[in-house]
Structures are given as C-alpha cells and as structure tokens.
C-alpha cells in the first residue's frame, strides 16, 4: 500500500523516506514545496513513486485520488521559530494539518505528524501535559493548538493519530535549513571556515557553553516514527528526545575532536580546546535575554510506556557520526 510523506524533501521528511526505503518500501508519494529548489538534493538517493506540490495534495487526497493509503507521515510545516507572520504560520502549520488529519480519519489512514518541543516554551518541565505547555512564539503556538485538537479528537478516533514533540534534532540532510539548521551543523562549518567554534558565555546561572538542550539524532527520530508506524494501535502525543540534556560544550567538543581525529590529531578536553582558542565564548546577546531556553530535557515516561525501549544516541556518538557524514559530502 502507498505511504505518503509530506515535507519529503526537508530534513526529517527525507530521512523518513530513506528509512522507509531501507525497509524495502518504495511506493512512497513525496509531497513538498520546492520553491527552495535546492531541497531536491535530499531525495536524489531515495526511491519514490510520485511527487506532488503541497498546494494540490490535500484536496486530491481527500477525494481519494491515491487509492488505498496506509499511512501519512506529516513533516511539512514552517519550522522557522523566528517567523513573525502569524497568519502564514497558522494557515501552514495549523489549518493545513487539521485538514489532513480529518481526511486521514475519514479514510482510516494512519496519521503520524510532527509536533515540537516549542510547545513547552517557558516551562521548566517537559512532560506531555497541558499545564506544562507555555509556547513563546507563534510557531510553538501553532503546534500547541493542533495538539489540543488532537487531544479532543483521540477518544473518538478509529485510526491512529500520533504526534511527536521533536526536541533539538540534528543529522544528515539539514543543509538547506540555513539559520534553523542544528548547532552541530553550524559548529562544524564554523570550525572548518574559521578554525574555532563560538559559544555563548555564562548566562542565567549557567557557565560558559553550559546551557543545556536535549539533542537528538535524526536516526533516532526515524526509528521512533517507524516504531509507531509498525504499531497502528498506539496513538497519542509523545516527546521525542533522548531524555538526557547535554551542554553546548559537548556538541562543540565532539565536533572539533572529530575533525581533529580526521587529521590524525589527538582529542582534547573542552578546557584544553578553550585554552588553544579552538572554542571561544562570546557575551550572551542582550536581545536574547528573557527569551532563551537554557535547559530542555524530554520526559520519556510516556514514550517508554508505549513500548519503545531502544536506547538513544548520545551527543558524543551521534554528532561524531554526523560529522563523519558531513566530511564525506562533496564540497
């Protein structure tokens, strides 16, 4: 049966297409908006059966134009947390997703969609519960509002609905994202071009480079998506992070040491890298004061209770693997 991936040429979408291919699935309809044409590169090594623009897709799917569809992985959205056009954000992230979910429910199609840890915003607890959801921007609000609709819909739903609250995802196929690409991607390119990695200095009780996030490899993101794809009886909204906050220093140290290793140089500690000027700390920007999350860490209780038991890659494992992938890409 056909599988549909929206946002298929994007970061997580393209990795999902590749993950499905690795399982022998090739009857995949890719849906995206290729206004940013360079995204096509993410699909060059993937097998798909068709491509559609997002503007024509929902209406055609609701009409049943694609026959029997098993599942939709909905990764297509505006993921720019700095976007200030609320009307565009709500139309793209909320209304479009709502129409797609309704069409899936009408046809009994599994619906697996991208939510976001941005729904938690100013919270210091990251558990899938309404009391901890305090979005700070319209992107977070668009995801938050749709999650509320899902909660009201689930009791009467006759087919699977699963939302994944992605934390700080990094990994292959994100190069088109510009400023919204991961810290690992930016650290890698900064070190290659400037010979140093710059991190924020101390702020809000956290030491220099010590602000912490839940950094999760896209490899694990794909595995969790496919676990729920294989278990259509499981529905709900789930955090998708490692459950382990790590400091930005860990990202920078892993990036620099992986690049040093490729040159036959020994690994250095974070302190040694700073002493050598390979990691530098800059004053925390005034513009970000009061608007910056210094700590995120996924509560994995609900995910583990649903039966997902595989371990997650640490920064040291996942970022090193990602850097080696980046080094292998053509210039």
UniProtKB/Swiss-Prot annotation:
Residues given in the record as substrate binding sites: 168, 179, 186, 200-203, 213, 292
Pathway the protein acts in: Nucleotide-sugar biosynthesis; ADP-L-glycero-beta-D-manno-heptose biosynthesis; ADP-L-glycero-beta-D-manno-heptose from D-glycero-beta-D-manno-heptose 7-phosphate: step 4/4
Keyword RNA-binding attached: no
Keyword Isomerase: yes
Organism superkingdom: Bacteria
PANTHER family: ADP-L-GLYCERO-D-MANNO-HEPTOSE-6-EPIMERASE, NUCLEOSIDE-DIPHOSPHATE-SUGAR EPIMERASE
Subunit structure: Homopentamer.
Protein name: ADP-L-glycero-D-manno-heptose-6-epimerase
Organism: Ralstonia nicotianae (strain ATCC BAA-1114 / GMI1000) (Ralstonia solanacearum)
This protein's encoding gene: hldD
